[in-house]
Amino acid sequence: MFSTKKSQGNLHKYIQRQSTDEFAVKAREHNYRARSAFKLIEINEKFKFLKPESTVIDIGCAPGSWLQVVVQKCPNGYASGVDLQNVLPIRGADILSLSDITDPAVKLKIREKLAHRQVDVVLSDMAPNPTGDNATDHLRLIELCRSVFRLFSVENEIELVKNGVYLCKIWDGSARAEFVRELSDRFSTVKTVKPTACRDNSAELYLFCRNFKK
């Protein structure tokens, strides 16, 4: 059985960590919904891919911190987000909540929302619910990233512009090299990045893919 005492202890540790974590504190100060906003900000500062007029879609956008950054960086563009969870509205962003990207009806809604726009940037910071087994969780996240990749590389549900960008989160593991090879077939540049906002003990990495090959 699940221990209530253990659960309360874990919650206390989480609250204590959040109260002193540099990026969690900064997120509250800047009204971002999560500390992950600073991961996107840092990656964008490095590669400068979010332009004022960019069309951006964020797959797995809950709680919305990346969309908040996109709206700020792309004031004359278009920002769209999709997530299985309910996502509270963000001024300037078009959000599809309670939506599974593998559902054909959701894919149709995405196309309708984009209204024939070509997409400059596809983002994915989503993650599966952890099983407790690192190898399994790694493979499940790679498959999620691959499913997003297929949306624009195979299925054409999203029309990524030539030279477009795909940025996705992975957890490091055995399938990373193979997935990077797949991405490299369709992008001229694939970089692995670990922003300073990632926790030191985390296996979290980001794959930044630029210059999509039509």
UniProtKB/Swiss-Prot annotation:
GO BP terms, alphabetized: RNA methylation
Official protein name in the record: rRNA methyltransferase 2, mitochondrial
Catalysed reaction equations from the record: a uridine in rRNA + S-adenosyl-L-methionine = a 2'-O-methyluridine in rRNA + S-adenosyl-L-homocysteine + H(+)
Signal peptide residue numbers: none
Cellular compartment(s): Mitochondrion
Keyword Glycoprotein: no
Pfam families: FtsJ (PF01728)
Entry's Gene Ontology cellular component terms: mitochondrion
Main location as per UniProt: mitochondrion
Molecular function GO labels: rRNA (uridine-2'-O-)-methyltransferase activity
Range of the transit peptide: 1-18
Active site: 169 (proton acceptor)
Native source species: Caenorhabditis elegans
PANTHER family reported in the protein's UniProt record: RIBOSOMAL RNA METHYLTRANSFERASE, RRNA METHYLTRANSFERASE 2, MITOCHONDRIAL
Family: Belongs to the class I-like SAM-binding methyltransferase superfamily. RNA methyltransferase RlmE family.
Protein's job: S-adenosyl-L-methionine-dependent 2'-O-ribose methyltransferase that catalyzes the formation of 2'-O-methyluridine at position 808 (Um808) in the mitochondrial large subunit ribosomal RNA (mtLSU rRNA), a universally conserved modification in the peptidyl transferase domain of the mtLSU rRNA. This activity may require prior 2'-O-methylguanosine modification at position 809 (Gm809) by MRM3. Essential for late-stage assembly of mtLSU required for efficient translation of mitochondrial DNA encoded proteins; methyltransferase activity is not required for this function.
Record: residues binding S-adenosyl-L-methionine: 63-66, 83, 100-101, 125
